[in-house]
Design a protein with these regions (language model features):
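A polyanion-binding, active-site-adjacent surface
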Residues: 2-159, 167-169, 174, 178, ...
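Short, flexible loop segments at boundaries between secondary-structure elements
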Residues: 177-206
């Protein structure tokens, strides 16, 4: 993978329109740059772990440009990526995202910098209510599946984990022959099971 490939991917991502119920954070150059810094860090070594979620959330990726990553994570995480890039990243506010805390917490506990992505890389919300989340439509997920296919083809992670049912369905559709793990999404009371399932998957990462 090359920096040119990263630039082309992010440029195409940023070209997608924002609508009254679907926000594209990557149209903001500051958030697109956060993602670029993250991807450029990941290409230095083979990616061992990818975790795929459902969609960008209003407390996380919609504010930072990074899946499962809130402004609080940008500010406080001790992960090697944030420790080395924090001063170069754009941060707005200090809000936290529970799912992001759990995902990065698992990664940090096992000493990995994961490739984080979403089945839908944009933020679906109620019309006119950007500070809400909603379940993505099938049509939206089909758009997201194009980018999902590209990102996994580019990084070729060793282990792929679907976080939640929507991610599991999209991965199965895009990569029908891919052997991947499926775990409970940590939201809505699923954090304990999520952490246990991830610990089992990542035993070899110690």
């Amino acid at each position: 993978m090359t920096i040119t490939a990263i630039d082309a991917f992010i440029t195409e991502l940023a070209s997608q329109a924002t609508t009254k119920s679907l926000f594209n954070p990557f149209r903001d150059e500051r958030l697109a740059n956060n993602l670029k810094l993250y991807f450029n860090f990941l290409i230095r070594t083979p990616v061992r772990l990818a975790m795929i979620g459902e969609a960008a959330g209003h407390r996380g990726c919609a504010l930072t440009g990074m899946p499962f990553t809130s402004p609080e994570t940008l500010r406080d995480s001790r992960n090697p990526f944030f420790a080395s890039h924090r001063e170069r990243m754009f941060r707005q506010g200090d809000i936290f995202e529970p799912s992001g805390r759990w995902v990065w917490g698992v990664a940090d506990a096992h000493g990995v910098v994961p490739l984080l992505w979403n089945a839908l890389p944009f933020h679906p919300h109620k019309p006119g209510e950007p500070r809400t989340n909603r379940t993505p439509t099938r049509t939206e997920l089909e758009t997201g599946e194009y980018f999902l296919g590209r990102i996994l083809d580019i990084f070729k992670p060793e282990v792929v984990v679907a976080v939640g049912k929507k991610a599991e369905q999209s991965l199965g559709k895009v990569f029908p022959d891919l052997a991947f793990h499926a775990v409970r999404h940590p939201a809505m009371g699923g954090s304990t099971l999520f952490k246990a399932q991830m610990a089992d998957i990542l035993k070899s990462f110690a």
